[in-house]
UniProtKB/Swiss-Prot annotation:
It comes from Shigella flexneri serotype 5b (strain 8401). It is a multi-pass membrane protein. Part of the MsrPQ system that repairs oxidized periplasmic proteins containing methionine sulfoxide residues (Met-O), using respiratory chain electrons. Thus protects these proteins from oxidative-stress damage caused by reactive species of oxygen and chlorine generated by the host defense mechanisms. MsrPQ is essential for the maintenance of envelope integrity under bleach stress, rescuing a wide series of structurally unrelated periplasmic proteins from methionine oxidation, including the primary periplasmic chaperone SurA and the lipoprotein Pal. Keywords: Cell inner membrane, Cell membrane, Electron transport, Flavoprotein, FMN, Heme, Iron, Membrane, Metal-binding, Transmembrane, Transmembrane helix, Transport. One of its GO terms (cellular component) is plasma membrane. This is Protein-methionine-sulfoxide reductase heme-binding subunit MsrQ. PANTHER family: PROTEIN-METHIONINE-SULFOXIDE REDUCTASE HEME-BINDING SUBUNIT MSRQ. HAMAP family: MsrQ (MF_01207). One of its GO terms (molecular function) is electron transfer activity. Its cofactor is FMN; heme b. Binds 1 FMN per subunit. Binds 1 heme b (iron(II)-protoporphyrin IX) group per subunit. GO terms for biological process: protein repair. The keyword Hydrolase does not apply. It comes from the Bacteria.
Length: 211
C-alpha cells in the first residue's frame, strides 16, 4: 500500500517534531546540568552528531523510497536536509562563540585553514548552505539542470563530514566509526550513480585538458 499525499504531510509533521526533540533536550541539559565536565565540547559533539544523523536519514530516503516502492517518500528528503543544515550551523556557531569566544572570532579564519579537520567541516557546511539555499522549487526551476548537479555535492558532504568527526576526536571510539560505516553503506547503495558522476567528471576534466 502506497503512502498518500495526506499521509506524507502527517509524516512531515512527525519528522519536524522529531527534529525539535534534540534541541529541546539540549536546552534542558544546559539548564539542568545534563552535560559532562566539558559542556562546550558536549554541545559541539551533540550538535555535530545530530547533523550527521539528519544527513544519513536524508541519504536513506531515496533508496528506501525505491525499494519500498513509496515514491512520495522523496518529499520528506528536503526537510531532513534542512534540519541537517540547522544542526550543522549550531555546531559551527557553538565552536565559534563558545570555544573561541566573541573576542577571538578574528582567529576563526586561521583556525579553519590550519586545522585540517576544521577545513573539512567548513567545506561541508558551505555545501550544506548552498543546498539549503537552493532547496526550494523556485530555485530548482531557476537552476534547471544545474540544480541536480549542485545537489549531487551532498555525496561529498557524506564523505567529508564523517572524516571531520573521526579527525576531531582525540580517542577513536565506536561512535564515529559507526557513523562513518553507515555513510559508506548509504553511499554504496548509490554506487551506480556515484560511478556515473565520477566518469562524467573524469570525462569533463579530460576534455578540458585536451583543449
Amino acid at each position: 500500500m502506497r503512502l498518500t499525499a495526506k499521509q506524507v504531510i502527517w509524516l512531515k509533521v512527525c519528522l519536524h517534531l522529531a527534529g525539535l526533540l534534540p534541541f529541546l533536550w539540549l536546552v534542558w541539559a544546559i539548564n539542568h546540568g545534563g552535560l559532562g565536565a566539558d559542556p562546550v565540547k558536549d554541545i559541539q559533539h551533540f550538535t555535530g552528531r545530530t547533523a550527521l544523523k539528519f544527513l544519513l536519514a536524508a541519504l536513506l530516503i531515496t533508496p528506501l523510497a525505491r525499494y519500498a516502492k513509496q515514491p512520495l517518500l522523496i518529499r520528506t528528503r528536503r526537510l531532513l536536509g534542512l534540519w541537517c543544515f540547522a544542526c550543522a550551523t549550531l555546531h559551527l556557531t557553538s565552536y565559534a562563540l563558545l570555544e573561541l569566544g566573541v573576542n577571538n572570532l578574528p582567529l576563526l579564519g586561521k583556525e579553519l585553514i590550519t586545522r585540517p579537520y576544521l577545513t573539512l567541516g567548513i567545506i561541508s557546511w558551505v555545501i550544506l548552505l548552498a543546498l539549503a539555499f537552493t532547496s526550494t522549487q523556485s530555485m530548482q526551476r531557476k537552476l534547471g539542470k544545474h540544480w541536480q548537479q549542485l545537489h549531487n555535492f551532498v555525496y561529498l558532504v557524506a564523505i567529508l563530514a564523517p572524516i571531520h568527526y573521526l579527525w576531531s576526536v582525540k580517542i577513536i571510539s565506536p561512535q564515529p566509526l559507526i557513523y562513518a560505516g553507515l555513510a559508506v553503506l548509504l553511499l554504496a547503495l548509490r554506487y551506480k550513480k556515484l560511478l556515473s558522476l565520477f566518469n562524467r567528471l573524469r570525462k569533463q576534466a579530460h576534455n578540458k585538458l585536451s583543449l
